[in-house]
Amino acid sequence: MALDLRNLKHLTANFSFRIMIWIMLCLALPTDSKPISTTEAPILNITQSPSLNISSPSTLEPSEPLKNCTTFLDLLWQRLGENASIKDLMLTLQREEVHGRMTTLPSPRPSSKVEEQQLQRPRNLLPTAVGPPHVKYRLYNRLWEAPKGADVNGKPIQFDDPPLPYTGAYNDDGVLMVNINGKHVRFDSLSYWERIKRSGTPWCIKTPSEKAAILKQLLKAEKKCRTTSKRITELEEQIKELEKTSTSP
């Protein structure tokens, strides 16, 4: 049995190493995407989601209407800077999804008693599993189900909310969701080895149709924060180019 455990650890370590080698090779390849500019997408007076403990930039261009949101995707774009390409964005996004985000989510300290944990409101947590008839929230290693009529993060729980349309997609907040036992779960709420198993292929070896599908999801998340921007225009142009490539013989 001890030998089997050692072999298992060796195999999982090798798998993690191969994932990192793929990402490093992708970073070394020349980019085939246009740079994404972030100079015209600063943010002002955002009513920050209680799940994000992040300070926002202090300027805003009046020509770019801003909605009430701050997403991980938006913050990542700001951090990478104006010379970041779509390839840089996607590889950084995947690396942080698997190995941990530089922007962390605060979590409440749970009670030591199981009964109190079941009743404790998971403040500052976003839903990790959605779909009728119940909505559950992750509280450390437990799934917490709110009583009917309760609200989480100031939003009343809707038991008829439909599940996400498909597995392995970014939601409107730019957060990757995966399907676990029929439930849509936040990818970054899984354990490290579970994230490794579900990390998918690096951006540079995805097909044009796979890239276009992902960029459409991220474009939808970007439009949640702003209605018009150069970044949105460049994303739309990149999607059109990828769709042409995927349909060409």
From Swiss-Prot:
Ranges for region Disordered: 101-120
This protein's UniProt keywords = Early protein
Pfam families xrefs: MMTV_SAg
InterPro entries per the record?
MMTV_SAg (IPR001213)
Source taxon at top rank: Viruses
**What name does UniProt use for this protein?**
Immediate-early protein IE-G
Q: What organism does the record attribute this protein to?
A: Saimiriine herpesvirus 2 (strain 11)
